[in-house]
From Swiss-Prot:
<dbReference type="GO" id="GO:0000027">
    <property type="term" value="P:ribosomal large subunit assembly"/>
</dbReference>
<dbReference type="GO" id="GO:0005840">
    <property type="term" value="C:ribosome"/>
</dbReference>
<keyword id="KW-0699">rRNA-binding</keyword>
<comment type="function">
    <text>Binds directly to 23S ribosomal RNA and is necessary for the in vitro assembly process of the 50S ribosomal subunit. It is not involved in the protein synthesizing functions of that subunit.</text>
</comment>
<protein>
    <recommendedName>
        <fullName>Large ribosomal subunit protein bL20</fullName>
    </recommendedName>
</protein>
<dbReference type="InterPro" id="IPR049946">
    <property type="entry name" value="RIBOSOMAL_L20_CS"/>
</dbReference>
<dbReference type="GO" id="GO:0019843">
    <property type="term" value="F:rRNA binding"/>
</dbReference>
<dbReference type="GO" id="GO:0006412">
    <property type="term" value="P:translation"/>
</dbReference>
<dbReference type="InterPro" id="IPR005813">
    <property type="entry name" value="Ribosomal_bL20"/>
</dbReference>
<dbReference type="GO" id="GO:1990904">
    <property type="term" value="C:ribonucleoprotein complex"/>
</dbReference>
<dbReference type="Pfam" id="PF00453">
    <property type="entry name" value="Ribosomal_L20"/>
</dbReference>
<comment type="similarity">
    <text>Belongs to the bacterial ribosomal protein bL20 family.</text>
</comment>
<dbReference type="InterPro" id="IPR035566">
    <property type="entry name" value="Ribosomal_protein_bL20_C"/>
</dbReference>
<dbReference type="GO" id="GO:0003735">
    <property type="term" value="F:structural constituent of ribosome"/>
</dbReference>
<keyword id="KW-0694">RNA-binding</keyword>
<keyword id="KW-0687">Ribonucleoprotein</keyword>
<keyword id="KW-0689">Ribosomal protein</keyword>
Length: 118
């Protein structure tokens, strides 16, 4: 049986890691042992922050809706309750977009929510 030399696969693996580490400062982009640590840490941060991004955007949308609905005298929680009772099924992303870009349409939504709460 022939001897298997692993130079090709090792070189390819090192090249892959160093390509991912491109743009890092100092030895982090040139030295494999340092680069692999930095790349693994960066991938962990990326994984964590993809999940955090969803939470952050939801919180931002809620703040925008709250600000918009309070401008017309209705707090966020009562506004959302009124929308649900009125049968208006818009998600928070769309509601926040309407609150910013189309205040007149948002005002009519607030009025419908208030009417449904009565």
């Amino acid at each position: 049986m022939a001897r298997v030399k692993r130079g090709v696969t090792t070189h390819a693996r090192h090249k892959k890691i160093l390509k991912l580490a491109k743009g890092y400062r100092g030895r982090s982009s040139t030295c494999f042992r340092v680069a692999i640590q930095k790349v693994e840490k960066a991938l962990r941060y990326a994984y964590r922050d993809r999940r955090a991004k969803k939470r952050n955007f939801r919180a931002l949308w809620i703040q925008r809706i709250n600000a918009g609905s309070r401008a017309y005298g209705l707090p966020y929680s009562r506004f959302m309750d009124g929308l649900k009772k009125a049968g208006i099924a818009l998600d928070r992303k769309v509601l926040s977009d309407i609150a910013i870009r189309e205040p007149d349409a948002f005002k009519s939504l607030v009025e419908k929510a208030q009417a449904a709460l009565q």
